[in-house]
């Protein structure tokens, strides 16, 4: 598609899979970066859930894809020798085509057991007197004793308003600012072939920042 086809909503950012449907299918299995789930449920439980999701991805079409890992990597020792710290992580790289197929297979497995309502804006979310959640939409009101909200970046402002209405405290996440430097693939091939993607930290000797 060379230009916008004027679809009712942007299918690249919304819908089943959201923005992730057309990503390169990279899944980081680590507590070192990418989120702070471990702060709420503990590091061990967080890792168990990440591996659980990884198992589902593999079972739904990701079999045969490579799981890269920093464990026992010679680059970790090389980093330490140069005052650098290689963050521990495993990375499952599905690739765009397989990632889309995994999501397609997931939808096929779920559609007979779950009611999907697309293009259904949630106007308000409240808690009833008996502790149930009530979601008001333009297609009616849905209630349930458990509610999972996963709106991504496109719904972050709406999510903030929901938290305010339910008196849920919020805080801003840290934003890492960096410089993107592109080099020929041959330069980084020894690293990317083994780790695919690595996070390397350098702390200044004087201020440790």
Indicate where each model-derived feature is located.
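N-terminal entrance/gating region of PLP-dependent enzymes' catalytic architecture
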Residues: 14, 39, 58
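Residues forming the flavin
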Residues: 1-36, 68-209
